[in-house]
Amino acid sequence: MRVVFWNIRAGGGGRAAAIARQIGAWEADAVALAEFRGTPPSGELARDLARLGLPYQSTTADPARPGVNGLLLASRWPLRRLRLPCAPSEPCRWLLARVLAPEPLALGVMHVPNRVGGRKYPFLDAVLTTARRRWATPVLLVGDTNSGRIGLDEEVPAFNRIEDGWMRELDEAGWTDAYRHLRGAARAYTWYSPNGGNGFRIDQAFLNRALRPRLRRFRYDWGRRPLGRPASDHAAMILDLER
């Protein structure tokens, strides 16, 4: 089972068709997108994904606020939304669903706010509370967390003790960072600051104890660059699970 997460940047815009083609080339069974919007390009992207064999879809995008970033989850198998009182309270930035695949799992998608406005740390706390609950099934959490480990996921200092501590506490709660599990301390960056050009690994996937034995492969992928530029300013995550 192949799961792809990708922050597609501002709803995809004129890049939406290229994003769909790239996802098709990856042959995903489930795709989670951040910065999906209630705009015509995002809508066409969702329809393209359905044509690619991912017809079961759930989104947090709000058509009444088309410029607001949301999430999309598209799957080869039916989805059942899950709503937990302990989950983050920002409806556009959190989506949790059960994927009714032959080997079912719960899939949580997040786009953590940045530090501006004071929303980030309550969001991280809610994710951690959700992760610490007693899960009876395999669970995968994916997303753009705007967080990372100090000195490991950054080219220049950017992350603070709260963000680093959040990553550590997830690990202590039994959640495995898929990339670190397979690659150890190897460096990888999923986003580069537009001014300084410095790299940060802010897109991650976490598996609970029940799902970890099914992890087979994980990689970051910037996709094809037919015009010399990637289709998004974030690398995608491609995660392969044993069916």
Q: Which residue ranges define each predicted feature?
A:
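Active-site beta-strand/loop signature of hydrolases that rely on acidic residues for catalysis
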Residues: 2-8, 19-42, 107, 127-154, ...
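Acidic/histidine-rich helix-loop elements
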Residues: 3-14, 116
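Short catalytic/ligand-binding loop motif for oxyanion handling, primarily in non-cytosolic enzymes
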Residues: 12, 40-42, 66-67, 116-117, ...
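Structured beta-strand-rich core segments of catalytic domains in phosphoester-bond hydrolases
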Residues: 30, 35-115
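Metal-dependent phosphoesterases centered on the DNase I-like endonuclease/exonuclease/phosphatase
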Residues: 47, 52, 123-209
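Low-complexity, intrinsically disordered Gly/Pro/Thr-rich segments
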Residues: 54, 214-228
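Conserved beta strand-loop-helix elements of the APE1-like EEP
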Residues: 66-81, 99, 195-214, 241-242
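Short proline/glycine-enriched turn/loop segments at secondary-structure junctions
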Residues: 192-195, 225-231
